[in-house]
Amino acid sequence: MFAKLENLERRFEDLEQQLASSEVFNDQDRYRKLTKAHADLKEVVDVFRRYKELRQNLADNKELLDDADPEIRSMAHEEAKSLESAIPEIEQELQLLLLPKDPLDEKNTIVEIRAGTGGEEAALFAADLFRMYSRYAEIRGWKVEILSANESDTGGYKEVIALIVGDKVYSRLKFESGTHRVQRVPATESQGRIHTSAATVAILPEAEEVDVEIRPDDIRIDVFRASGAGGQHVNKTESAVRITHMPSGIVVSCQDEKSQHKNKAKAMKVLASRLLQAEQDRQHNEMAADRRSQVGSGDRSERIRTYNFPQGRVTDHRINLTLYSLDRVMEGEAQALFDALSTHAQTEALKAQADVQ
């Protein structure tokens, strides 16, 4: 591990020298690539340098343990104990930083939320989930754009699809795929009985042209009139678009825009991301056919989390985590929840790496 870290530090220093060159600065394409490579290495190099500094301080303190002055020996002993306890933590941090990066982590994300069992209450819960992710995105400084929405009669969502754009969106949201269950008393419930309903969430990395090739011969495009809640026509022209990808059977519809061209562009964006996710799932299943991911498969049918409003708790069943801060989570303050999922995934990756070695 440490030989690899030394190589990374040398690479980092080489990049710093190149970035200081006027020749590189004048070549903006090269400058951008080197800047990104430099940024990718900075965290691990900074931690490695801190680790080496701790090691050096520990060696210096151990020399003072033989000092003639008992007070200096005592101080050196206490300092050495403190340094020895800090070093294993830094070593684990370095191990985590050296784990292979998910190439999709940097991507923007398409979030698909669909009401499940529970009728109108499920549609209202789907809207609550969309608001939670939107508020979280706002807190993170990300941008949310609705690509498609099918509203229910009570103001919920039968389905809503949105694009979230920002820094490392997929890395933070990728564990959200699955079935989310809610337990609460609906506003229409006169007896005060708790109802259970559900919504499914799918998290897809936004596909770029280089990621997915969609051949024109592989798709069928149908146009139709857009309709709103209750089935009433909201557009007299055939602006809504339905795209069918015939090889995979994936169907995407979009009717939010008045322009057929804009609806087609949005539907193509969703289709490309679904195809990319399908390919990633296929590769994942091939590589991990003999073991199931401990954070969950991301299968939409998998119940991953329960939101219990009477008790004010949210429970993630994959990692046995319960937080009694449901109100804050629903307002987008979900950092602790997402951090716990990310940490668990990293821990499992370290275990898997140790098993291979």
Curated annotation (Swiss-Prot):
It holds the Pfam family RF-1. One of its GO terms (molecular function) is translation release factor activity, codon specific. InterPro entries: PCRF (IPR005139), Pep_chain_release_fac_I (IPR000352), Pep_chain_release_fac_I_sf (IPR045853), Prokaryotic/Mito_RF (IPR050057), RF-1 (IPR004373). The keyword Protein biosynthesis applies. SUPFAM superfamilies: Release factor. The keyword Nucleotide-binding does not apply. Residues 281-305 have a biased composition (Basic and acidic residues). GO terms for cellular component: cytoplasm. Keywords: Cytoplasm, Methylation, Protein biosynthesis. Its main location: cytoplasm. Methylated by PrmC. Methylation increases the termination efficiency of RF1. It is found in: Cytoplasm. Residues 281-309 are annotated as: Disordered. NCBIfam families: prfA, PRK00591.1. Peptide chain release factor 1 directs the termination of translation in response to the peptide chain termination codons UAG and UAA. Belongs to the prokaryotic/mitochondrial release factor family. This is Peptide chain release factor 1. It comes from Nitratidesulfovibrio vulgaris (strain DSM 19637 / Miyazaki F).
